[in-house]
Amino acid sequence: MNKNCDYCGLTIYSETYHKCVESSVKINDETKIVNYKIITIDELGILAGKNDREAQDEIVYRYLNQDAINLSQKNIKPINWENIIERAIDDQYFTYFLLFFAFDHDEYHVIFDVLFDVLFENVKLAAKTGDSMAQYNLGQMYYRGISTKKNIQKAIKWITKSADQNNKYGLINLARFYEYGDGVLLDIDKATQLLEQASCQNFSKAQFYLGRIYMYKDPPDYKLAFKYYQQAANQNHSSAQYFIAVFYKTGKCVAQDYKKAVHWLTLAASQGLNSAKIKLAEMYMKGIDVEQNYHKAFELLNSSIYDDGTNNYYDEVAMTELACMYKRGLGIEKNISKAIYLHIKSRNTKNIFKIFEINTITFINPINVDCENNNLSDIDQLESKIIYKLQFLMIKLKYEWSNIYHDDISNSLQEIENSFTRLIKLRIQLNNSSAMINCLSFKKNTSYKFDVFNTKNAYVNYYVYDDISYINIGLNNIKLVNNFQKNLDKFMFCNIFLDLELALENKHKEKIDDLINAVKNDDRSHQLNIVKDLDNIKFVLSQTKKISSKLIGYVNILMNDLKSNTHIRNQQFQLEYANIFGYD
């Protein structure tokens, strides 16, 4: 089982593949000589972010000469490195790295566009003076339309000039043009010849591309493919290491050897290659020439989707496998909610339908609201009427009936209005959401709906209202419905109204005492004012009882409103999760 560094917390796949990013001299209390050539791209990225120049240079080297572009990208942020413009002006290899990186990271395109606008003339000038690396970079800028118009013929012209000077980057990219017939006539033999020329410079990228050409040509030449993959793998090219492992695992053109397969997969996985992690996890799951270890398999799969910041086919494969592990409780505590989340994210509808079935039940008939003969036809009018009555009383108390005003009365009315307004907002949010749906339901005779009840931080939740089952999928939907449930509390409103009635009764007793004193003092004018105040208190009491009755009735009507709008929420859910219903 892998361990984690006591200092930085990162996974230590092996002592040779870890350098602590918090302590430059120690790994778990042991003094280590730092060797940037053998630490992972993730760790290099963290160090580079702290402007460790050696780490930055190693990242550039791996992008140029190996296949770092297929590895973890989460910590590689050259835009934050110091003096990148000056470095790019002085170093065409660094410019190549920035071009390579920018192409795969659209999120930085605005910043990089400005950067390359500055660099374009510098690259063009250097290319014209015969700098083979600048010629290659200029070709790439024309090919991708970076700081200039796209022009594939100019791209080929400058990359050919670079290749003519035996520049290995120019050679392999010109080979790609011929391999795919991009701007030139398709010519696999020409592509192979160019790659062999680059391979003679011990260039692992060229060796890998040669291996791929021989592997996928018609007919394939597996022996030559293995030869070139082996050469690249020996230079730490992770994708080549993966293919060497596949050769040994399948026994294609070499003797089947699971130990060697595990060895090469471990090397590639240690660098962060997702495909290798998934294949290695499979071997641990099945116990193929390694001790069966579900926990190890889970760690590998989990790191492939959460640790590397990529989003590709292999992420979806890993998510599907992880979902099955969560569903069965293999290597991790059983969690159906998490399994559903991963199945949905991986777009694996086949497995989703083992848990859910699609329903056609909807509610499309609008409700009619009849609350104490108010002739209201919809819930919006009822809400407006309740809000109006509450605000009417608050304004009267504050500006016209100041003699019976009391903070407890005002605060209770304000609390009722705030709680009711909050409930209205939640109703509107809910009916415009994809929560509380019934277009999906749990398969019958399964324990899934019961399992989700016991899940902390659930992604899926199951509710029953008025004998109708609803499902929520997604953290935001669950949070919304939980908040709605919390505010949909008749007892909360009842308690506030009890406080309000108590405050009004206290004010009524106070006025009765005032009236007795006024009678004793024979103060007729004051007596009339107090009688008027008592009438106002009775009016407020009668109105609050009516509002209370309407609010209790509103809660019941609200549930009917949610029921009648289920079809709208179903449609919204189907739009958000179109792949489940086969719409995309």
Swiss-Prot record:
Q: Which UniProt keywords apply?
A: Repeat
| Alphabetical list of SMART domains matching this protein | SEL1
Q: Which InterPro entries match?
A: Mitotic_Regulator (IPR052945), Sel1-like (IPR006597), TPR-like_helical_dom_sf (IPR011990)
Any keyword Nucleotide-binding?
A: no
Q: Name one Pfam family in it.
A: Sel1
SUPFAM superfamilies recorded: HCP-like
Does this UniProt record's set of keywords contain Repeat?
Answer: yes
Q: Where are the Sel1-like repeats?
A: 132-167, 168-203, 204-237, 238-273, 274-309, 316-351
Per the record, the domain of life is Viruses
**Which PANTHER family does this one have?**
ACTIVATOR OF C KINASE PROTEIN 1-RELATED, CHITIN SYNTHASE REGULATORY FACTOR 2-RELATED
Protein name, as recorded = Putative sel1-like repeat-containing protein L18
Q: Which organism is it from?
A: Acanthamoeba polyphaga mimivirus (APMV)
